[in-house]
Amino acid sequence: MHTDLWERGCERLAAELPEQQFNTWIRPLPPADVTLAGDGVLVGLRVPNRFKLDWIRAQYGSRIEATLSELAGKPVRLELSLLPRDAVARAQGMAAAPAAQAGAAPQPTQSPMAIGAALHAAATARHDPQSVVPTPGGSANGRAAPRVGEPGGPVGTSTLPVAPTLSPAVSRGRLNPALTFDTLVPGRANQMARTAALHVVGAPGHMYNPLFIYGGVGLGKTHLIHAVGNALIRDNPDARVLYLHAEQFISDVVRNYQRKTFDELKAKYHSLDLLLIDDVQFFAGKDRTQEEFFNAFEALLAKRAHIIMTSDTYPKGLVDIDERLTSRFDAGLTVAIEPPELEMRVAILMKKSDAEGSRMPEDVAFFVAKNVRANVRELEGALRKVLAYSRFSHKEISINLAREALKDLLSIQNRQVSVENIQKTVADFYKIKIADMYSKKRPASIARPRQIAMYLAKEMTQKSLPEIGELFGGRDHTTVLHAVRKIGGERQKNTELNQQLHVLEQTLKG
């Protein structure tokens, strides 16, 4: 029989997969139902929510089947299904019970191991008096458990303010329901940030906490953190999720400072399960705001709530922000969102035009994508111009129509960005001579800026590789291609280089 097939499979997967991946996605799963099915084996797994089901199927399904087939010596088919909602709730209660019985404060999220151990029992529990599981804030007999500081309750500091529950309706009110993972176009530019965000949804409070996402304006940072909030609320409607811009937090601090009501501020922010905050660079120079955010930050991490922040620069690049904050920002995972590459820009245009009910032909999408390189926001603006021009003129969408609709934008871009301008800007930035861009000198202090200038020339102009090579002292197109690939690859890994390129791009765009 293959009764221990899943257990042996887990041991194999634990040895082969990165520890964080295994602990997040595989280890929490309840014991599998293993049955013989003809010449093969059927392995049934029950998963607590739709997001995890889709992710496990897409990322690990084939690998799980292959591993189990090898161990079983016959074909294995993996069948994933959703656990009933009440079973998930009972599992979370069972995972929390030992801590509650020991007098510990219940955590907002349980460890993957604890929840996984409880899922199977919860799914098969019978509705009898012996199987009722105490829930946080309640007891097995259905009566509410006394709170700290109440008569008959546990000994505690009754003078501390009790944090009011943040209404999920209020939390959802600040989230844009249209900004989801389904409407986010994936690509190389946002791959790391998107993957990290998906891991947060799968195991909030456990991985990449805090998650710090940085990048230029209009690249999709806000979309991504809204997607996390929407996914978490979809899977757990009672989750206390709050999205806000940094300026809103500043306003809250000022208002509560004027009213001397800082307990209200703490009650609002310290009771969350997920805090999503945009543009933390706005905290610069605001000492009281930084102090209150530090307090909220520490309180949330202590209760294993998750924090996701965005900024226009990486933590160490933030100016006039206390080092104890920036060091904590950098303590989890810091990822960049880059300007979208050509193929991603085309995919964005096609998807957005479909959503508008007007399919953009692929050749037109490539034309627009080649000419609008800055960010997703400008790309969407260009799309709206083309679609509006098509409707108003009653003409089919074509390259000529797009060229006419975007003539002002194209003339500005052509006037602003040239290879010569790029060479001058890069030379000034790295303090070398413009003549070094054309020379045959190869010291790293010159060759590196020259490669960066070639990369920017390919990314920001319409010039071909041979044309760019000619403008860099008659170099071969393969030299340019090597520079483009080298700098493009390093940009994904080197935070300092990415920041330098971001500054250069913004300077060139004016």
UniProtKB/Swiss-Prot annotation:
GO BP, sorted A to Z: DNA replication initiation; regulation of DNA replication
Pfam families assigned: Bac_DnaA, Bac_DnaA_C, DnaA_N
Residues annotated to bind ATP: 218, 220-222
Region (Domain IV, binds dsDNA): 391-510
Entry keywords, A to Z: ATP-binding, Cytoplasm, DNA replication, DNA-binding, Lipid-binding, Nucleotide-binding
Chain intervals for the UniProt region annotation (Domain I, interacts with DnaA modulators): 1-74
Chief localisation class: cytoplasm
Residue numbers spanned by region Domain II: 74-173
Subcellular localization(s) per the UniProt record: Cytoplasm
Record note on domains: Domain I is involved in oligomerization and binding regulators, domain II is flexibile and of varying length in different bacteria, domain III forms the AAA+ region, while domain IV binds dsDNA.
Family: Belongs to the DnaA family.
HAMAP family reported in the protein's UniProt record: DnaA_bact
Annotated protein name in UniProt: Chromosomal replication initiator protein DnaA
